[in-house]
Amino acid sequence: MLHLQKGSNTLIRVWASYDWANSVYFLVITSTIFPIYYGSLFADNLYIEIFGQSLKNTALISYTTAAAFAVVAILSPILSGIADYVGNKKSFMKFYTYVGALSCIGLYWFNLDNIYFGLICYFFASVGAWLSWVFYNSYLPDIAHPEQMDKASAMGYSLGYVGSVLLLVVNLSMVLNPSFYGIEGTASEASVKAMKYSFISVGIWWIAFSQIAFRFLPKNISKNPLTNKVIFNGYRELSAVWKTFSNHPILKSYIGAFFVFSMAVQTVMLIAAYFGEQEINWGSSSEKQIGLIVSITIIQLIAIVGANITAQCSKKFGNLPVLITLNFIWVSLCLYAFFVRSPMQFYIAAGFVGLSMGGIQSLARSTYSKFIPKTDDTTSFFSFYSTSQMTGIVIGMLLFGTIDQITGSMRNSVLFFLSFFLIGAFLLIRIHRRMTN
C-alpha cells in the first residue's frame, strides 16, 4: 500500500475525500429530501399516535434524533478507547460507514404503515454517520501539521459541500422530472417514489467514495490485545482528558463554550428543513419541494465560500474573534427566523446561514486542534470533543422537540435557542480576554 507522509497534500486530500462521501447523508437525509418526504407523510395530520402518545411529527423526529445522538455519545468513548488501544480506528470508521449507508437504503421502505421500521432505519443512519465521523475527525492531527489544520478542515467541508450538492442536483432532477428516469405513476406518486430512490443513492454514494479514505488513510496498527478492561478505557481516557484540562484552563474554557454554541448550531441545522417545510407559506406542494431544495442548495454552495472566508479571516484576526462574530451572526439569524414566513425571506435566511454554518463548524474544529496539548493520544481528545458535541445535540433536540410539542410551533423553539448563541459568544469573549492579558 502507498505510504503517504503526514502533511502531504495528497494525504490531506485523501482524508478530505471522506467528507465528499459522507456529507451526502447530512444534505440529502438530514437537510433536504428526507424532511420533505417525511413532511409529505403527515400532509393530512401533523400528529400521530405512537408509543402510546399523540406526538407532533416534528417533535417525534426530534426525539428520535436525540435518541440516536444519546447512543453516539455513550458509545463514542468506548469505541474510541478501544480504537486507540488496539489501533484499529479505521476498522470502526468502516463499520459505521456501512451501518449508516445501508440504513439510508432502508429508508426506501419508510411509511406510516411501518413507522417503527422507518424510525429504526433513520436512527441507525444517524448513528452510523456520526460514529464514523468521530473517527474521521480524530485523523486530523495525524494527517496535518498544526499550521495546516485550518486549511485541511476547510478543504474537508468544502469537498463535502460540493459532493453533496452534486448528488442533490441528481436527486432534484429525479424528483422534478421522474418520468425521465422511468419512474411511473401520477405526478405526486412519481415524485414521492423519486425521493425514496434518492435514499438508495445516498447509501451507494457513501459506500463507493469512502473507499478512497479506507484505502490510503494510515491504519495506526497496534499489537495490544482486546481485553475486558479495554472496553472501558474510553471512559478512563475521557476522565484523564478532563484532568488534563486542569493544566490547560484555556482549553477547558473553550470546550465549555463549544458545548453551548455547538448545541445550538447543530440543533438549528438539524431542524432547518423541517422548519421550512412546516412554517413557511409555500404556494403549492411542488413549490415547497423546489423551494426547500433550492434553499438548502443555497446554504451548501454559500457554505463553501463561508468556510474559506472564515479560514482567511482567522489568519488575519485570529480564531476566537472570528468565532465570537459568528455567534452574534447566529443570534441575529435566530431572531430573524422567528418572523420569517414567505419563501423569499426563507431564501435570505438560507444565504446567511450558509455563510456562517461552514465557517463556524470548520473553525471550531481547527481551534480545538490547536488548543489540545501535543500527544499521540489524539483519538481520546477528539472523542471528548465529539462526546461534548453529541451530548449537546441530545439536550438541544430534546429541548427543541419539547417546546415544539407544548407550543405547537417551531418558531418558539428557534427563538429560545438564540440565548445559547449569546452565552457562547460571552464565554468566547472571556477566553479571548484571558489570552490577550
Q: Which residue stretches match the model-derived regions?
A:
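Juxtamembrane intracellular "pre-TM" segments in multi-pass secondary transporters
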Residues: 2-13, 218-255
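Multi-pass alpha-helical transporter architecture, strongest
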Residues: 12, 109, 205-216, 360, ...
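Structural signature of the two symmetry-related core transmembrane helices
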Residues: 91-106, 321-336
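A membrane-interface helix-boundary motif in multi-pass transporters
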Residues: 54, 175-204, 402-421
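Loop-to-transmembrane helix entry/capping segments in MFS-fold secondary transporters
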Residues: 55-58, 146-157, 289, 369, ...
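Helix-to-loop junctions at the C-terminal end of transmembrane segments
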Residues: 74-88, 305-319, 404
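Helix-loop junctions at membrane interfaces in 12-TM secondary transporters
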Residues: 108-121, 338-350
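Short amphipathic helix-loop junctions that connect adjacent transmembrane helices
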Residues: 29-57, 270-290
